[in-house]
Amino acid sequence: MGARKKISAEKRKEALKTMYFAKLQNVPTSPRKMRLVADMIRGMEVNRALGVLKFSSKEASARVEKLLRSAIANWEQKNERKAESGELFVTKIYVDGGATLKRMRPAPQGRGYRIRKRSNHVTLFVDSKSTNDNQN
């Protein structure tokens, strides 16, 4: 590994120590449907976001709820203390498209229609309000 590449890798590693996030990869839901759920909780306090996700009728909300609980646990693990009520917020959440499986469906007159089974990757960041104020 070159010197510049090693330095940038070390900087990236140091930056990750102060970020609290969780990733969910290869979720078999279309990114469009998952983004609807992500938009519901973006910027919310985590306890309120958990309540919104728990009572949402969308199938993707259960997966995002589990991801949010994982991000909270990651924050608690790195800070070595429990998160207090109203302390943590969902700072960023984004949904990227994953691999698309292409399948064929029989159609009239010997043709075949292509079915695209989409998947996505979700990345969720949480942080405390005090560190958000310092960054802005």
Swiss-Prot record:
By its UniProt entry, which InterPro entries does this protein fall under?
Answer: Ribosomal_uL22, Ribosomal_uL22_bac/chlpt-type, Ribosomal_uL22_bac/org-type, Ribosomal_uL22_sf
Checking SUPFAM superfamilies in the record gives: Ribosomal protein L22
Query: Per UniProt, what is one Pfam family of this protein?
Result: Ribosomal_L22
- Gene3D superfamilies (alphabetical): Ribosomal protein L22/L17 (3.90.470.10)
Q: Does the keyword Ribonucleoprotein apply?
A: yes
Q: Which GO terms describe its molecular function?
A: rRNA binding; structural constituent of ribosome
Report the GO terms under cellular component.
Answer: cytosolic large ribosomal subunit
Q: What biological process terms from GO does the record include?
A: translation
Which keywords, in A-to-Z order, does the entry hold? Ribonucleoprotein, Ribosomal protein, RNA-binding, rRNA-binding
Q: How does it assemble?
A: Part of the 50S ribosomal subunit.
The record ties this protein, via HAMAP family, to: Ribosomal_uL22_B (MF_01331_B)
- Function text: This protein binds specifically to 23S rRNA; its binding is stimulated by other ribosomal proteins, e.g. L4, L17, and L20. It is important during the early stages of 50S assembly. It makes multiple contacts with different domains of the 23S rRNA in the assembled 50S subunit and ribosome.
Q: Which family does it belong to?
A: Belongs to the universal ribosomal protein uL22 family.
Protein name stated in the entry: Large ribosomal subunit protein uL22
Q: Which gene encodes it?
A: rplV
